[in-house]
């Protein structure tokens, strides 16, 4: 029996061109170019969704480190003090606290310092 493809190919190409909307030049007009651009864009999006998590964690650590060094404590010592003092604040919240409410952050640093001392 003969298999008729109907409009399968057209639908597939239209789907790719729709994804390529907004790309520059031939990247949004010609199927082969658009297909390559879309595949690369999807690969980058997949990779960068994972990278974003790493990048934000690095940013939070850098901010916390800067804030703790201003108080005379290294980042590693600060985290050690938090663990020993059973203070369960994640790095995102610590970075926000250091940026938005320095007084409260100072209290957390002091609590970590005392937990390390005891």
UniProtKB/Swiss-Prot annotation:
Domain of life from the UniProt record = Bacteria
Give the GO biological process terms.
ribosomal large subunit assembly; translation
- Gene Ontology MF terms: rRNA binding; structural constituent of ribosome
Could you state one GO cellular component term attached to this entry?
Answer: ribonucleoprotein complex
Question: InterPro entries recorded for this chain?
Answer: Ribosomal_bL20, RIBOSOMAL_L20_CS, Ribosomal_protein_bL20_C
Alphabetical keyword list: Ribonucleoprotein, Ribosomal protein, RNA-binding, rRNA-binding
Question: Function, please?
Answer: Binds directly to 23S ribosomal RNA and is necessary for the in vitro assembly process of the 50S ribosomal subunit. It is not involved in the protein synthesizing functions of that subunit.
Q: Which family does it belong to?
A: Belongs to the bacterial ribosomal protein bL20 family.
> Could you tell me what this protein is called?
Large ribosomal subunit protein bL20
């Amino acid at each position: 029996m003969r298999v008729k493809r109907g409009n399968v190919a057209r639908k597939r190409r239209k789907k790719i061109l729709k994804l390529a909307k907004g790309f520059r030049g031939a990247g949004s007009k010609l199927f082969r170019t658009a297909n390559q651009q879309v595949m690369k864009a999807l690969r980058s999006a997949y990779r960068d969704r994972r990278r974003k998590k790493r990048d934000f964690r690095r940013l939070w650590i850098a901010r916390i480190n800067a804030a703790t060094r201003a108080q005379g404590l290294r980042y590693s010592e600060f985290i050690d003090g938090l663990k020993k003092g059973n203070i369960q604040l994640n790095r995102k919240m610590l970075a926000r606290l250091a940026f938005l409410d320095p007084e409260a952050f100072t209290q957390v640093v002091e609590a970590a310092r005392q937990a390390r001392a005891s």
